[in-house]
Amino acid sequence: MKKQNVGNACGWADRLARLLLLPALTLVLLCSCDEDKAKSERPEEGDQLWKIVPVLASESDGFEGLGEYGVSLYLFNDMSSDCYKYQHADSFGDLEPFVVEKAAYSLVALMMDRDVPHVFYEASDEAKKNTTVTVTDMNETIPDMVLGTASVSRNVGATVPVSDLQRLVGALDVRLTDVPNDVTAVELTVGDLYDRVDLTGQYDFSTGEPASKRIELTKEGTVFSARSVLMPSDETRANVKMDFRVFRGDAYEDFVVRLSGSIPADKLTRLEGRAEEILKNAELTLGLTYAPWDASITIEDHFQTDDDLNKVWSSAPLPIS
């Protein structure tokens, strides 16, 4: 009888343990199912990412060769003025896609036909939206520079056309004809110029004062001429100052030209005149007209002088910054 009682007690203990274990197993299974369901409803990491492929918009056809320019590409998150991602490539076709979280962004592309040490800008993801591009030596050859932008929102496709193209520089053609044989050299200093522009296309002066650019004209027989890319002039001024320095051996004379208007970006201006007019001791006043970047114009085939031909001009060196 005692053995039987002991056996029954053990059986009841075993059944009791099983009954206590069953709710715990059920709870574990339910939690496991809920966790699996949550995982299935949670988006994969790839669904949170977005590939942005920058391309030049079709309107870039008006900018010959732009696709082969070196490009610095900045990606800004619209919630911040800080650059989120940056890359540089030798041409637009060499750019890599940006892979980022889905959000609202803006692309800014700075394109130049060549890299030069005297054009300084922040070429990294340390850039800001108001980061500036500064020409540190205006007398050196200035490259063609074009700014392009694009807005990027969540509902666009992967390919993002960079449009809103803005050429940041202008060009000036100068041609003096019928130059006297004893003239050995001619220099032109164009004043009232900007030397800095930011990534939004706003110009200013790095020193707080207008800059200038010296251009040496090339002699071919009795013609002195030059073509130069330059930064635009201060649009708040009524005219542009041009100082011609005419050399006869080591001696020189200075002549001042005031051009009505401004020298704009994205325009080509051709200034042509007979040297016998400009070499008179008088202040010259001309009106500027403009043409597209890939065209040229002639303002006049001679220079107009004012009535006072008795002005005395200093031969002191001109300030060239």
Q: What do these predicted ranges mean?
A:
Residues 39, 52-64, 176:
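Short amphipathic, basic-aromatic surface patches that mediate peripheral association
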Residues 34-37:
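Bacterial signal peptide processing site
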Residues 91, 114-160, 250-282:
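Structured interaction patches on ligand/partner-binding surfaces of diverse proteins
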Residues 67-122, 184-267, 313-321:
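Tryptophan-paired
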